[in-house]
């Protein structure tokens, strides 16, 4: 093994911009000021981080039939939608809605920067995004009520030196 890590203990933090479009280097927190739960206390998984890479074929017509096709990378990035799967209950709903309200109170084109920290890592994964309200999830009898909350990504700094908080 090469030092694999588990997902238990992941921290999900956010911080508002002081200057629109500039990633904060301090002030990251795990829950809204009026929230009860840290985000990681109700999130059970995350998706949407994997990059989709568009490519263009540049194989010349002189290539033999069984020759190797050639490609160049074009645009890359994810689909802009980060989904956090979560257990839904009144406390998690209210905690998420408090985060959404904090974002809606920002002015001047400011947004949140989010940071994902894996246990034992010296770097965090940073992206800028707007949290969307929590909607009523699909549900079935005999199952825990779970659903997704979504963050619409608008920028990404990728892996950078982590900005941790003691209480996160």
Residue ranges and their predicted role:
Residues 95-98, 160-168:
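Short, charged, solvent-exposed linker or helix-capping segments at domain edges/interfaces
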Residues 1-2, 168:
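Glycine- and charge-rich intrinsically disordered segments
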Residues 19-21, 31, 120-123, 166:
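Polar, enzyme-active/binding microenvironments
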Residues 81-83, 111-113, 146-148:
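Broad gene-expression machinery/nucleic-acid interaction feature
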Residues 2-85, 128-144:
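Solvent-exposed edge beta-strands and adjacent loop segments
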Residues 88-91, 156-158:
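Acidic glycine-/aspartate-rich tracts in secreted/extracellular proteins
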Residues 93-128:
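Short, acidic/charged, Gly/Pro-enriched secondary-structure junctions
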Residues 115-162:
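Short beta-strand and beta-hairpin "edge-sheet" elements
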């Amino acid at each position: 093994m090469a030092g694999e890590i588990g997902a238990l203990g992941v921290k999900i933090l956010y911080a508002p911009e002081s200057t629109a479009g500039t990633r904060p280097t301090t002030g990251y927190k795990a829950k809204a000021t009026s929230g009860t739960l840290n985000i990681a206390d109700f999130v059970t998984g995350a998706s949407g981080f994997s990059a989709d890479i568009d490519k263009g074929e540049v194989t010349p017509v002189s290539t033999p039939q069984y020759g190797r096709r050639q490609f160049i990378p074009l645009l890359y990035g994810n689909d802009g939608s980060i989904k956090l799967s979560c257990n839904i209950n009144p406390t998690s709903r209210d905690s998420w809605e408090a985060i959404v309200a904090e974002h809606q109170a920002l002015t001047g084109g400011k947004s949140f920067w989010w940071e994902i920290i894996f246990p034992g890592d010296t770097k965090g994964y940073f992206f800028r995004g707007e949290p969307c309200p929590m909607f009523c999830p699909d549900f079935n009898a005999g199952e825990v009520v779970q659903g997704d909350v979504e963050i619409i990504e608008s920028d990404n700094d990728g892996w950078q030196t982590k900005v941790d908080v003691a209480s996160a």
